[in-house]
């Protein structure tokens, strides 16, 4: 085991996680974690390992994955960990990487030192660090299926997320027998930095966060461990308080992109169904990525009397999006607040858009901010979370016919044109492709039956499906389902009635 620890220390030195002076300290700490009396650390062996380390192995995370697997095998054999479930192993190998992860104060000092030269240099450092210390598990991320599909709005991004660990049924059963916890209050709380974890809360010994001020309020910046797109970051409030879309949010989004102009930042909506999975803690998501919606041009331009100095338009997109931009940040915030206030109380019964049911509000906005040179830009995606008898999960939500592919909420990431699809689809779509090739009836298959209508449509549409083309065809059709999902979520549809309805709303802003 000494040799494996020396290889891990070589990795730590090579990546800059630790320095030469930390070697013996880390070696002893790791030996203590693994409960064995070590021989003296062989520093010559470490030097040799550093020479042999291949850049591509480091960058893919493969070298680290192999070392951690050896450590986990040892821990299991010695009874240090009780089983080989993903949850148990993740709790332990995160403790291991915590030994190689510097204290928060040092990481923050390094970040701001780099920031003083260049915000981009600072984020590149922090993103690389978050990968090197295994907070972002690159060897899992690369398992995700990612591809693009053509649409009338440009390319859409499709991902089938395989890197998020599946919940272990045995561990779920155990949870019912364990005491409930209130610390940390949620996975976004600042108190999760360095937290040791438990069955229902991932270990965070290698987790580091960077303080940022947004409109004078204290926030923290981190990367998502699941990286749905390049440099996928999360910016969360220092207090555990609910999401709320208001004029202050627009100011916070712009405050961030002013400080990090190479990143966008957006917020999920603040209502159930159209919001994200965490409404209890104010947070935003951003990153260094151009989404399909950002690349899409304007379908129509318009002006508002109150804001002659700003540009406005309707984005050519399946959802209902107003884009505004201008040089004056405060004017952009005022315009966005004005549109939000008007939309909160706006109804159009002819299009089934009702602002309230009794005292329950339905209208809100998903905002996304960017900096384009001197211009501040904001996309305002109009959302409504009404439910009906026919659509009990949401009228402007994926309709039931698409649930075989996507039934979860359409949050910020999907709104912008990136489908995050469940892991079950990897196997299901592969098996569906085989069934189509073999002309199998799947109507009574307990797993594939949900895809029956989808498969029939594919069979009708494509005459000559071969082993070489079936995967590409199924993937393209999944992309079309995602497009339909986005259309369902749009409140002003793309037919003439919908376009006229959108124009009526714009006219109401004058």
Predicted segment positions?
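Active-site microenvironments that recognize anionic phosphate/pyrophosphate groups
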Residues: 1-242, 316-318, 332-336, 342-510
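Coil-to-beta-strand transition motifs
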Residues: 61, 230, 262-264, 277-279, ...
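Helical scaffold of the NTase/Pol beta-like nucleotidyltransferase catalytic core
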Residues: 206-208, 238-265
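Structured alpha-helical segments in the cores of large, soluble enzyme domains
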Residues: 219-224, 249, 253-257, 303-310
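Amphipathic alpha-helical segments that form well-ordered structural scaffolds
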Residues: 252-256, 338, 481
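Catalytic or ion-translocation cores adjacent to nucleophile or general acid/base/metal-coordination motifs
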Residues: 257-277, 286-338, 344-347
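Beta-rich nucleic-acid/ligand-interaction surfaces
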Residues: 272-280, 358-364
């Amino acid at each position: 085991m000494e040799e494996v620890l020396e290889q891990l220390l070589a990795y730590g030195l090579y990546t800059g996680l630790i320095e030469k002076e930390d070697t013996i300290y880390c070696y002893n700490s790791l030996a203590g974690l693994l409960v064995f009396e070590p021989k003296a650390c062989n520093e010559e062996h470490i030097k040799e390992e550093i020479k042999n380390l291949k850049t591509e192995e480091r960058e893919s995370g493969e070298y680290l994955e192999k070392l951690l697997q050896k450590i986990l095998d040892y821990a299991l054999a010695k009874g240090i960990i009780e089983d080989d479930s993903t949850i148990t192993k993740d709790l332990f190998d995160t403790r291991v990487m915590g030994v190689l992860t510097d204290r928060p104060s040092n990481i923050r000092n390094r970040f701001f030192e780099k920031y003083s030269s260049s915000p981009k240099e600072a984020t590149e450092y922090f993103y690389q660090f978050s990968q090197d210390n295994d907070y972002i598990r690159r060897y899992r991320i690369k398992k995700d299926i990612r591809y693009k599909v053509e649409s009338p709005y440009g390319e859409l991004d499709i991902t089938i997320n395989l890197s998020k660990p599946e919940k272990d049924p045995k561990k779920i059963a155990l949870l019912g027998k364990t005491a409930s916890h209130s610390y940390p209050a949620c996975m976004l709380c600042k108190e999760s930095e360095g937290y040791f974890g438990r069955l229902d809360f991932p270990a965070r010994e290698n987790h580091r966060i960077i303080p940022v001020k947004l409109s004078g309020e204290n926030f923290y910046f981190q990367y998502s461990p699941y990286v749905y797109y390049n440099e996928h970051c999360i910016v969360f409030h220092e207090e555990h308080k609910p999401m709320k879309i208001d004029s202050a949010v627009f100011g916070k989004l712009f405050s961030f992109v002013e400080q990090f102009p190479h990143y966008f930042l957006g917020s999920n909506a603040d209502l159930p169904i159209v919001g994200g999975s965490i409404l209890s803690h104010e947070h935003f998501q951003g990153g260094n990525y151009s989404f399909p919606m950002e690349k899409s041009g304007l379908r129509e331009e318009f002006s508002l009397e109150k804001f002659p100095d700003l540009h406005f338009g309707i984005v050519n997109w399946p959802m209902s999006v107003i884009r505004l931009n201008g040089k004056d940040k405060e004017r952009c915030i005022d315009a966005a607040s004005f549109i939000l206030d008007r939309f909160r109380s706006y109804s159009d019964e002819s299009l089934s858009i009702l602002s309230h049911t009794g005292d329950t509000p339905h209208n809100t906005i998903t905002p996304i901010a960017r900096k384009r040179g001197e211009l501040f830009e904001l996309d305002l995606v109009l959302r409504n979370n009404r439910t009906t008898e026919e659509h009990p999960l949401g009228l402007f939500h994926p309709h039931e016919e698409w649930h075989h592919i996507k039934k979860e909420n359409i949050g910020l990431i999907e709104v912008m044109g990136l489908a995050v699809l469940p892991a079950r689809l990897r196997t299901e779509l592969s098996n569906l492709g085989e069934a189509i090739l073999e002309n199998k009836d799947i109507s009574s298959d307990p797993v594939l039956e949900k895809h029956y209508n989808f498969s029939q449509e594919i069979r009708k549409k494509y005459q000559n499906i071969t082993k070489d083309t079936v995967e590409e065809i199924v993937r393209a059709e999944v992309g079309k389902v995602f497009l339909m999902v986005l259309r369902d979520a749009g409140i002003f549809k793309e037919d003439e009635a919908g376009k006229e309805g959108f124009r009526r709303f714009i006219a109401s802003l004058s």
